[in-house]
Amino acid sequence: MKFSSAFKFGATFVVACLFSLNSASANSYEQIKKDGVIRIATEGVYSPFSFHNEKDELMGYDVDIARAVAKKLGVKPKFIEASWDAMLAAFDAGKADVVFNQVSITDERKKKYDYSVPYMLSYSAIVVHKDNNDIKSFADLKGKRSVHSVNSMWIPTVEKYGAKLVVADSLSDQINLIITKRVDDTIDDAVMFYDYIKQHPNAPIKIIEAGDEPMYTAAIVKKGNKELLNKINNALNKLSKEGVLSEISLKYFGKDISK
């Protein structure tokens, strides 16, 4: 269900106010060890990263990594689920100790949060029909029909390279338009396409990794919570060396996107 911006703001404001009435600080590592629990904020509705399966079990790339980190820390994970805005409001209010939910690393967020070492690396990518040999990079998009949702973050890229915008809400709808050759392409984070191809291995499409700048995803903790950050970083580094992150990545994407 889609909400208007005004409703979304109002709902988020109410949630933030409710959290502020009973605000608490994010736990220190010592308190987490004492309690035996680390509180992890995540959305729970963002497949394949954080979602519920047919048995209503919480799973996903970020969720599995969070569980593996908790195990390395010797504590149990307690997941705090909420929509993106409400999730961050809960985290800001001290209701969670860490966020594992596809938080991309940006300079703006670095002012407010401390990031862990990255656990996902991806690039922007273009998807076209497997028979399309005209598009090999962003420079080839001029005059092409590029399909995106109405609020897509990729619309400025479409405009920059002179493509013609076609609107379709879901990724499946967008790719169906490509398969039927009613549009030429769509643009997104490459991992979204890896997931689609894993679910639809016979789809007549191909991925063109066109971005030069890597996009990193990491966990966030409260600014200054250095001991917890160091423990999470140590856990992630060990999981990487042991091949656990690669295994989780292959499970969800059929490709290693952990490094």
Residue spans for each PLM region:
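Short loop->beta-strand "edge-of-pocket" segments that line small-molecule binding or catalytic clefts
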Residues: 36-42, 138-151
